[in-house]
């Protein structure tokens, strides 16, 4: 029974890692698409300094927004989990 629980835990960790990787890949893809559309008017062999600066600032803002949303969502999940646990304790 303990071995089965350990395998289940390991499987859950692998699934969480795969989800995190998929989320990171999706974020990178969206960031690339949005910043490219915003900053690159005429694609060529290289980026000029204005395009480089725009890409850098766009990526920084995108990451800041992503981190803010992630923290806020994580905090909300924790609050809801805490409320659920309190509710369960009250009914016991």
Swiss-Prot record:
Function: Mitochondrial intermembrane chaperone that participates in the import and insertion of some multi-pass transmembrane proteins into the mitochondrial inner membrane. Also required for the transfer of beta-barrel precursors from the TOM complex to the sorting and assembly machinery (SAM complex) of the outer membrane. Acts as a chaperone-like protein that protects the hydrophobic precursors from aggregation and guide them through the mitochondrial intermembrane space.
Alphabetized InterPro entries for the sequence: Tim10-like (IPR004217), Tim10-like_dom_sf (IPR035427)
Family: Belongs to the small Tim family.
Species of the source: Drosophila melanogaster
Disulphides: 35-58, 39-54
Name of the protein in question: Mitochondrial import inner membrane translocase subunit Tim13
Gene Ontology biological process terms, A to Z: protein insertion into mitochondrial inner membrane
Pfam families referenced in this protein's UniProt entry, alphabetically: zf-Tim10_DDP
Upper taxonomic lineage: Eukaryota, Metazoa, Ecdysozoa, Arthropoda, Hexapoda
Alphabetically ordered keywords of this record: Chaperone, Disulfide bond, Membrane, Metal-binding, Mitochondrion, Mitochondrion inner membrane, Protein transport, Translocation, Transport, Zinc
